[in-house]
Amino acid sequence: MIVPVRCFTCGKVIGDKYYEFKRRVEAGEDPEKVLDDLGLERYCCRRMLLSHVELIDDIMHYRVY
C-alpha cells in the first residue's frame, strides 16, 4: 500500500530508494542491477522493493467513516 520506510526484517532504511528503483526498472533496467547499485544486498531488503504493490491510489477513492 504505502512504501515501507524500513525493511520489516532487518530495519534498514529503504523508503528513500523506492522511487529511484521504480523509475529505473520502468525505464527498462534489470532489477537485480538496480538493487545492487542502490546498495541493497540483503535479500530481505531486496524483497521489500521487489514485492511492493502500489495500492494507495486505488484505496484513496473510498471514504473513511
UniProtKB/Swiss-Prot annotation:
One of its GO terms (cellular component) is DNA-directed RNA polymerase complex. InterPro entries: RNA_pol_su_RPB10, RNA_pol_suN_Zn-BS, RPABC5/Rpb10. It is found in: Cytoplasm. PROSITE patterns: RNA_POL_N_8KD. Binds 1 zinc ion. It is an enzyme of class 2 (transferase). Zn(2+) binds at C7, C10, C44, C45. Pfam families: RNA_pol_N (PF01194). Its main location: cytoplasm. One of its GO terms (molecular function) is DNA binding. It catalyses: RNA(n) + a ribonucleoside 5'-triphosphate = RNA(n+1) + diphosphate. Its cofactor is Zn(2+). GO terms for biological process: DNA-templated transcription. Its EC number is 2.7.7.6. Coiled coil: none annotated. Belongs to the archaeal Rpo10/eukaryotic RPB10 RNA polymerase subunit family. DNA-dependent RNA polymerase (RNAP) catalyzes the transcription of DNA into RNA using the four ribonucleoside triphosphates as substrates. This is DNA-directed RNA polymerase subunit Rpo10. It comes from Pyrococcus furiosus (strain ATCC 43587 / DSM 3638 / JCM 8422 / Vc1). The lineage of its organism: Archaea, Methanobacteriati, Methanobacteriota, Thermococci, Thermococcales.
